[in-house]
Amino acid sequence: MTTIQLNARIEGISKPNFWNNIHFHPTDAVEDLWGHEILEKLRDGSARYIRLYTMFEDVVTRNEDGTLQFDFSEQDKRFDYMVAAGYKLLLCFNFMSVAMAKSPNELSGQRYKDKRFCRSNPADYHEWEQLCHAQAQHLIDRYGLETVSQWLFHCWNEPDLGFWIYPEFFFELPPEKQEYKITEYCKLYDYFETGIHRASPKLRVGGPSCGHYKVFVDKVLEHVTKGTNYVTGKVGTRIDFVSMHCYSSIPQDVNDPLRFKICPESIVNQYKVYRGLMEKHGLGELPAVIDEWAAAAEGYLGIKEYPRFQFRESEYYAAFYFKLIDLMAQLPIPPERMMICLSGQDHNSVDFDGHRTFFTARGWAKPIRSAFQLAAKLGETCLPLEGTDALPQNLGAFATRTENGDIQIALYNHVSDFGQSGDSLPVTVKIDNLPASFTVERYRIDELFSNPFTAWSRLGSPSTPTVWERELISRHARLEKPRPDELGSHKLTAETLLTPNSVEMIVIHSLAD
């Protein structure tokens, strides 16, 4: 039995919530009914910032005289909804309009709504600056500087991969094309920064949001700190945060048991490497934004292609998420934002198909969604626990306090090797110096609680469940409590048995005298 203790009156350390943020994909689902259904469910306060694309392919055309014409009407539908819903935004400025492209035929494959994006660099970088300025100014005019200055803006998505200039990944290119790809991105960033800050110096900009290749990030950070600015001719370019993508694994690793390496530590280690590059270039004090993270890349692939993607449907992902929060919070400088990537939503045609989503095709909340909702209950003051120096393998615990004095104790048992059995771990939590009167809530995510996937599986995985079967599944498609709320006075002793890949949170609410 592991015993964990907390003095409820102890001072804590401020740790702002960096974990409740989302990359919502595809962006143009924001205007659709199914997109609204998802976003409405997230209006419970669990999502702080949401990342979207500007989708310049919907914005830019040319007039008959060859000058650029900007039409933000399609974009306005999306951002109007997001602002009205109370979301703060991180906007990724991409992709290139065909009308502006140096290579207009450099198009992606078919995407949502039969659209394609253009990966080309601009034919004229002054036009790119003009577009970035017009975009920023339009947002300020429409929503006000007070609102927009709270947002984040970054330049392009994964320029080291097949989204920028060439369809090949960085490592697949010969040295001269690698150099060209980096040089052109640095130029793109300089003109992006100039255009946005011509609208207002109060807007925060960053990049490069690379998908994997650290040498690309290294060269970009070298440019913004020591290189010659392509616009001003001076040394350096303003950067307010460094953005990055951190995926624990790629599908090929997931599919091969010998290379299976999904674990929160993988994401943390990648973040540390990026932090090291920031420090190398004198940017160690800047915020870092992980604007995409997930346990595995390529959310548009599911169980059909990679059977082990079943973990996206199960309690495994919930425990993974809580361990990731715990590990990141222990770092000297955690990320300012960490955005879980939901980029399989438009491929979600049947329930529990392994795509990277919060909800199934019928709208049932997966365990990872319940975990995201549960994590939003955590406070922003971290409290030290006693008895956590030598915890059993896979067991983790951390405590927080909210501004109103409520206390949250998070416990998890995460078995990284998905599909392998682990031990159930008994835990006792003792808390002293509590108020004279308080209530205790306990939330649970495991194989049974808050787990519609298990309920569906036990019914035989029906493709067309009956009304009664849907009812049985729906009862677990929400954040569940394993026991009724309790009353307490001055101190609390709580016992639990953490089964493999389970999460439990004890929430203590002070009652007025």
Q: Could you say what each language-model-derived stretch is?
A:
Residues 1-152, 172-209, 213, 280, ...:
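Non-catalytic accessory regions flanking glycosidase/transglycosidase catalytic cores in CAZymes
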Residues 58-61, 98-110, 160-166, 249-254, ...:
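Short acidic/His/Gly/Ser-rich catalytic and metal-binding motifs that mark active-site loops
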Residues 159-170, 295-308, 358, 397-410:
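Short, charged low-complexity intrinsically disordered segments located at boundaries
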Residues 181-331:
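Noncatalytic carbohydrate-binding groove/subsite architecture in carbohydrate-active enzymes
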Residues 307-312, 355-363:
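Active-site rim elements
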